[in-house]
Amino acid sequence: MGETLGVGKSAVTYTDFAKADLIVIMGQNPGTCHPRMLTALEEAKMAGASIVAVNPLPEAGLINFKNPQRVRGLIGKGTDLADQFLQIRLAGDMALLQAVSKRVLDAERARPGTVLDHAFLAEHCQGLEEFQAHLEGLDEEHVLAATGLRSEEIDELAERYMRAERVIITWAMGLTQHKKAVPTIKEIVNLLLLRGNIGKPGAGPSPIRGHSNVQGDRTMGIWEKMPPRFLDALQMEFGFDPPRHEGLDSVGSIRGMRDGTIKVLVALGGNLVHAISDTSVAEAAVRNTRLSVQISTKLNRSHAVVGQEALILPALGRTEIDRQASGEQFVTVEDTVCAVHSSIGRLEPISDQVLSEVSIVTRMAKAVLGDKVPVDWAGFEHSYDVVREHISHVVPGFEDFNTKIRLRDGFVLPHAPRDQRQFPTPTGKAMFSVNELDTIEVPPGRLILQSVRSHDQFNTTTYSMNDRYRGVKKGRLVLFISPEDLAELDLADGGYVDVHSEAPDGVDRVLRRLRLISYPTAKGCVAAYFPEANVLVPLDSTAEGSNTPASKSVIVRLEPSPN
């Protein structure tokens, strides 16, 4: 979205959902991965919104929601959510979006001046003519093959879109973990721009992140490609010249450790070897380092996969009281809709020897850098207000940070496209993009696999062996497969298979002895649990333009497991 809108964050707020006429949910399972969103969807539904779910799996949280905070949710049937469910084939989202946009443009041609938002397009957008010309060549049969949908289903979605004055399209990792994730998201922007669905209440693109503070990390500079203006602000604030060359993301870091160009790993939280793709390659890469350091709030698999020397540094979690020289501290979080709020621990730490992450990082910096840079590391540790004061001088939107964060509800960061219909792109306008439709070719007898989370799971942390919404008990080594595919492959529900991924590098990656579960997933598509299925995803299989592991489009073959 940064290329098309100038800002790579959600252009809606939490309250916008209740103002929308139509909400399209793509590649997302809010019931398991983003439960707070269910309340927003329920409020939208009660306010009259129509909801369309686009997903290979008919997830419970997309269909109905029983809100435990309402009487109806406790003893009634709950709230029906999706008015239309499009059971799309994996990696078919880009084709669907282009097909809907083409229908919108065709409707405008049939009824000139009545479908598109011409005033918005003329004032705020560029590239419509090129986009329109490109879609003239879109082949309907190609679309239907890529999506697994019927033309009538796409027609219905297009009609819903054209009837709605305010439209939100929201998505999660079901879209971002494909090779063509970046152009797919650009197609979301294209569709929204056609009818001016950006920069007005109840409308806009809404990416939902996979972790509670991943967006806040990026805002604070945790990115390998921070822009020069951010680095300039750091230099001005702290009096040193930060590196100007690009760094490495997680996939690039694993490659570097594998190849020996990276010799030290310092992991601030996380469970790298279990979260990243190509598990065996990742484990070998970390073991190839001279030193691995894990700064962690709890033990995980990565602590058993270490370099030649290893340190595990326990750290306070944000549920624990963090006492420093100036008193009890709090930290801050930026959520997926740009809202910033404080988080303060209430639990006594298990030991007074456990340090906060801020303490560990600042003490490391002081020990390594000393007086080489003019930074008051001790001041940072003693009072997090000092950290926030510096942030307020460096990061746009955080001016007067210490005052605003103490407001009861925190504050929402400014967003030029959302707030003012201003687009900080090189042209000053929102940009339509032209994206070539490229679908996955699946050989006969092969399937497309995606990795998914279970309900009792948060990222790589699993709390039970059950998945209540999908009816799975006492096990995670399972493969969800459609009844049609079971029949075509002459396999039986409850049988066991070895899953082999087929990649251009010719490496035989295999996940053995998965129990088959007949499930109403899209034909030709199967699903296995993350992180177990990471062993099947090649490290070099990533989204073009973002380098995100393509964990939702893995071509696999199934072979019966030996008894």
Language-model features: locations:
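Segments forming glycine/polar-rich beta-alpha architectures that bind adenosine-containing cofactors
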Residues: Q422-P424, A430-M431
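A short N-terminal beta-strand-loop micro-motif at the entrance of redox/enzyme domains
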Residues: N435-I440
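Non-catalytic alpha/beta scaffold blocks inside enzyme catalytic domains
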Residues: G2-P201, P207-H390, G445-I448, V452-N563
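Intrinsically disordered/low-complexity terminal segments and short unstructured peptides
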Residues: I169, G260, N402, P424-P426
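Short acidic, Pro/Gly- and aromatic-enriched capping/linker segments at domain boundaries
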Residues: V412-Q420
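Segments of small-molecule ligand-sensing domains
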Residues: F398-V412
